């Protein structure tokens, strides 16, 4: 498996039948997006990712498929002995709608050599995102912080993302991800910090709001990483998005986080309204849908919008 020093080593595979079952369950509960990503399995090839997308399309023509990190895309293209753009076109033809901008960690190769030496480098990550945008596939963007990086590395990471966005305008949101260390191999071997302080996490969200301004308009707070109490602070610090409700989150919980299985919408609605804000459902591309009610509280994507 190709991975990073921030990931635990236990791995598993999910069959196409199980993927279809989970998709159908999500649809039955009102989901409008399915998100898939994973590690690099030594037996996966270029057809694996295409078959996953096709299997979802067999059970739904309409659900938005948000899948495969730049690392997975790069792996698929290499297996196919083709360029990234050509491989992305095959995935798009199969039914892929957008990509998660994960596996970014910190976009500096000196840092990446420490935390994820087996992953793609900075330029390779950026090139996958650019290629996706060039064929009409939007992406998210992320940054994992609080491990071995310094403030300069954080600034450089944000600069790389902003420069890319000003060129291609395909990033829908920026998601700062505080490093969850408790079960991460790198931390257990004493090679990283124990994660950012709460104050650091809040400041990174605030700075990202100021720096990205109109270039990346949506700043998402990860309730999976920060919890409900943390989300309350982030709402005062520049975020306008609380992300997805989720049904089966495993990455953060496997690293030791206590949150991530499913969002309590009643509780989060009270937090949002206490900030004089309004909870509004959105889709993956940030089209606003409707205010959540008891009848649609199982919807997956939410958007925060200031009343004023």
Residue ranges and their predicted role:
Residues 9-156, 160-163:
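Conserved Radical SAM active-site core
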Residues 5, 35, 70, 111, ...:
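Generic signal for short, ordered secondary-structure residues
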Residues 1-8:
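Short, small-residue-biased leader/transition segments that mark boundaries at the very start
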Residues 21, 27, 159, 165-308:
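Auxiliary Fe-S-binding modules of radical SAM enzymes
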Residues 2, 128, 230:
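Conserved sugar-transfer catalytic core signal across GT-A, GT-B, and GT-C glycosyltransferases
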Residues 4, 104-107, 179-180, 247:
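Short connector loops/turns at beta-strand edges and beta->alpha or beta->beta junctions
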Residues 2, 59-63, 135, 168, ...:
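Helix C-cap/helix->beta junction micro-motif
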